[in-house]
A protein has these predicted regions:
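Iron-associated oxidoreductase/ferritin-like identity signal
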Residues: 1-161
């Protein structure tokens, strides 16, 4: 168990960094369906981080929230959006490639399964990114035939009076 807490803490930091990078990307990805997909992915990542944090705390460890996304996105429009999505697709695969061997070597079945679920969801996010790059708008499901195709853009920040 002595190796388990540091491993979970490192995984947590990597996942937190990934979530913060996705939040930064969501500010430049304006296409409605792609942005909704980012919101869905970020929500899942918040849930995953809560699972990992709970596991760390149950083992007597502490959770550090100091990870920085380290992402500065410049530009606007489709070019900036495409660059962010392409980078996130690559990062998702890199995350899985980096962590899968370590997770597969874990002997603690419950925590290994939890991390495998998270790795699977990272691959699902990668698939969403690839579909967005291909121009798909049915990322989170299909609309009824009676409705028009989605259109519109999302503002980079919330407008509150």
């Amino acid at each position: 168990m002595t190796d388990l807490v540091p491993l979970l803490q490192e995984f947590y930091r990597d996942k937190l960094t990934m979530m913060r990078r996705h939040a930064a990307a969501a500010r430049v990805v304006a296409q409605y369906d792609a942005n909704n997909t980012y919101q869905y992915i970020i929500n899942r990542e918040e849930t995953q981080l809560s699972w990992i944090a709970k596991a760390i705390e149950e083992l007597g460890g502490t959770v550090a929230d100091g990870a920085d996304g380290g992402r500065s996105l410049s530009g606007k429009g489709d070019g900036a959006s495409r660059a962010a999505i392409e980078e996130d697709a690559r990062d998702a695969q890199s995350f899985v490639d980096r962590w899968r061997p370590r997770v597969d070597a874990m002997t603690h079945a419950r925590h290994a399964k939890m991390l495998r679920v998270i790795l699977g969801e990272a691959l699902e996010a990668k698939r969403f990114f690839e579909q967005a790059l291909a121009g798909r708008t049915d990322l989170l499901g299909r609309r009824a035939d009676v409705l028009e195709p989605a259109s519109g853009e999302v503002l980079p920040t919330r407008w509150i009076e």
